[in-house]
Amino acid sequence: MPTAGAPPITDAFGAIAHPVRRTLVTELAGGDKAVSQLAAACTVSRPAVSQHLAVLRGVGLVSEQRHGRERRYHLHPERLDEVRKWMHTLDRFWGDRLDRLGRHLEENP
């Protein structure tokens, strides 16, 4: 259940729809990183990485902390819980449907 004030699940889906943002989320899953470290893992410029991070920040997937002149980013994976729950529901739905189809095809060759 989303918490009060949390961006809706569609925002999280939109944020992770872009391949660069998925790369950033994957990189941050390994721990906090600076923009320069994240840019090295991507095929886009540092300013583009910063723009993608702003989208992720906007939906609460990442937060930013300044350490001197460096900005470090932290992943908040709990924001993906609603996405994971929704995908699990679909997985169960389609799993059940495909199981029934398989049984039907075995019984009616």
Regions found by a protein language model. Give the residues of each.
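Short, charged, intrinsically disordered terminal tails
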Residues: G5-P7, D99-P109
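Intrinsically disordered, low-complexity proline-rich regions
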Residues: V35, V59-G60, P109
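C-terminal structural segments of small proteins and small subunits
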Residues: L80-H104
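Alpha-helical residues within the helix-turn-helix
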Residues: A40, Q51, R57-G58
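Beta-hairpin "wing" of winged helix-turn-helix
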Residues: R57-H74
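N-terminal helix-turn-helix DNA-binding core of bacterial DNA-binding proteins
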Residues: P2, P7-P47, E70-D81, K85
